[in-house]
Amino acid sequence: MLLMLTQWLQGLSPELSFLRVFQYLTLRAVMAALTALLIGLIAGPKVIRMLTSLKIGQPIRGYAMQTHLSKSGTPTMGGVLILGSIAISTLLWFDLSNRFVWIVLAVTLGFGAIGWVDDWRKVVNKDPEGMRSREKYFWQSVIGLLAALYLVFSISENSNTRVFELFITWVQSGFLMDLPPKAGLLVPFFKEVSYPLGVLGFVILTYLVIVGSSNAVNLTDGLDGLAIMPVIMVGASLGIFAYVTGNAGYAKYLLFPYIAGSGELLIFCAAMAGAGLAFLWFNTHPAQVFMGDVGALALGAALGTIAVIVRQEIVLAIMGGIFVVEALSVMLQVTWFKYTKRKYGEGRRLLKMAPLHHHFEKSGWKETQVVVRFWIITMLLCLVGLTTLKLR
């Protein structure tokens, strides 16, 4: 919005040519981060007071750890603060004609809406389970598939072909029609190695990355500050990849596919980092507010969508290794429990408690130890992911 305003003002008078500085993507990214940070810090106390007055407190499951019982009643749904800060800052500083930022915003707010309904049911109905899994997964799938279809259309080589005609062509090919090389699954650490994906493969991969990332971040959000800092670090790192893939010169030099327009995603990533830091100010132990599903589902979906656009799905799995391991710990725990119950008559557990962060708590780690150590691991994984920019 401000970019268009400065361009209009420059056209009015040559004396306003200094506003040309706002054409620089990096400057707008810094401003987006600062704007989101300030919005979050200023609005944070008011949002917390509002949530408290509405008695929107976090219900604690009956099987929760004893050390967590004191958190019952802590305001939740603080993710609205994060999403509001991101949305306002992004809309102010990005190029409104950029389709990639719009789709990321749409997916983020869509998954945020799912999380909002889930949190609201937990609070109003006093039901720690919230939305039933099938219902939640259904709506996640709807948004994930719509996003996947939009993205596969946006990267088609036949950009001048009408959408309906292109869709008919894909149907006739059984959705196996090849896509441009830049739409392939990029393999990190190898020079110009990518796995070609047809339309169907791209849609399935995109769907899995968005929905999987969303739920993985949600499962990680179980301790004060545990999820938000890794989201900040992974998001900032993806912003660097977006900047590279959106710059023809850098993309060519570093052997990345050039994706026109993806650089503007740096604005969103910067806003997400700023909003995340502001939220962490209130979410650090002992937390004054929790982000809830409205924040966790949305932020995870945002990371997944950005990774798909900049073709860094595997790198996302590396940098977000904590999210991956947390999700796998739950899947393995549930699978093993059901298998042993069917075979031996009683369920057995691989971990003392899932997700993994609770296992470490049960093993004697303090909450702050788990959180900070997971932060350190994420920082190292992000550095590994960033090395793929050059080590190819």
Curated annotation (Swiss-Prot):
Keyword GTP-binding in annotation: no
CDD domains assigned to the protein according to its UniProt record, in alphabetical order: GT_MraY (cd06852)
Reactions catalysed according to its record: UDP-N-acetyl-alpha-D-muramoyl-L-alanyl-gamma-D-glutamyl-meso-2,6-diaminopimeloyl-D-alanyl-D-alanine + di-trans,octa-cis-undecaprenyl phosphate = di-trans,octa-cis-undecaprenyl diphospho-N-acetyl-alpha-D-muramoyl-L-alanyl-D-glutamyl-meso-2,6-diaminopimeloyl-D-alanyl-D-alanine + UMP
Single annotated GO MF: phospho-N-acetylmuramoyl-pentapeptide-transferase activity
Cofactor: Mg(2+)
Transmembrane annotation, as ranges: 24-44, 76-96, 100-120, 137-157, 167-187, 193-213, 225-245, 262-282, 289-309, 314-334, 369-389
Its biological purpose: Catalyzes the initial step of the lipid cycle reactions in the biosynthesis of the cell wall peptidoglycan: transfers peptidoglycan precursor phospho-MurNAc-pentapeptide from UDP-MurNAc-pentapeptide onto the lipid carrier undecaprenyl phosphate, yielding undecaprenyl-pyrophosphoryl-MurNAc-pentapeptide, known as lipid I.
Family as reported in the entry's similarity comment: Belongs to the glycosyltransferase 4 family. MraY subfamily.
This protein's name: Phospho-N-acetylmuramoyl-pentapeptide-transferase
